[in-house]
């Protein structure tokens, strides 16, 4: 299983002072050096953490894989096509939320989704949809032309005991179903050093996307050490 590191919260910390440090690009390079297989950033409509210039510099610097998380808007479509990350991930977005709170509503957007994704496919940019671990959502993602589904693990992260085991089973079943219909499978949201280990047993999940847990651990142990620790946990 591979690790993709989300560096949004490095930008959040920088923006708290309105200055230049810590630099999310430097964080991305350290994460790659420590074993990350990809870098994730979310260019939100309100630009609350990652800025347009960050995205340009990340594109120039990242040598593994750049995954641009984005809302389904014409503005961000144009930016993504101009930037050419290896991968874009469509996520839901609400201005009032602190972080992404759930999966992309594929049922609501399905009628326009295929046309929206076509330019990315033509440009050779892989497309991922951040969705709930739900069979209908996975089927619609495949029909819309997605290459990858990122299964939302937020509920798993919030639960404990038997309820968490049930959610893990739901995620595992969803991953198997997605793989069987030809989709690549990744997972993310709320994963941390305490709850990640069971995902090593879900062989269909190729990659996990983790940000907040790594950045908070890095405050105490350093970023390179925090990334190396997570890489070791998922191998």
Curated annotation (Swiss-Prot):
1-deoxy-D-xylulose 5-phosphate binds at residues 8-9, 44, 49, 99. This is Pyridoxine 5'-phosphate synthase. The gene is pdxJ. It catalyses: 3-amino-2-oxopropyl phosphate + 1-deoxy-D-xylulose 5-phosphate = pyridoxine 5'-phosphate + phosphate + 2 H2O + H(+). InterPro entries: Aldolase_TIM, PyrdxlP_synth_PdxJ, Pyridoxine-5'_phos_synth. GO terms for biological process: pyridoxine biosynthetic process. Catalyzes the complicated ring closure reaction between the two acyclic compounds 1-deoxy-D-xylulose-5-phosphate (DXP) and 3-amino-2-oxopropyl phosphate (1-amino-acetone-3-phosphate or AAP) to form pyridoxine 5'-phosphate (PNP) and inorganic phosphate. 3-amino-2-oxopropyl phosphate binds at residues 6, 17, 190, 211-212. One of its GO terms (molecular function) is pyridoxine 5'-phosphate synthase activity. Homooctamer; tetramer of dimers.
